[in-house]
């Protein structure tokens, strides 16, 4: 069973909020889409008063359960390289897949959890679509 982790892109402040800083994901009202994130800028300790921050304009990204060749956790929205090709990680409703960054419709995709050889990952995360938009624009090698 994989770890359930999230990270959040705060659109207003243009910064990534990591899993260890997320205090609460709020689902207010009907539906399956969260509409508020409560987080702290500091590492959370049970002995200190927490300076809570609220985020309403965000993108929530789930951890795939897979790490890259440098043991970096892979999340939705990450950009990775596999066989000299760039991919963006998306969730298709059943599995995490890497979609060819050109999104031409004629592109290639791969299952993130299938990019392993002899128990080690053959992919490397090079950034994400929020903080490294230029990486996608560069295209494939």
Which residues make up each language-model segment?
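Secondary-structure transition motif
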Residues: 1-141
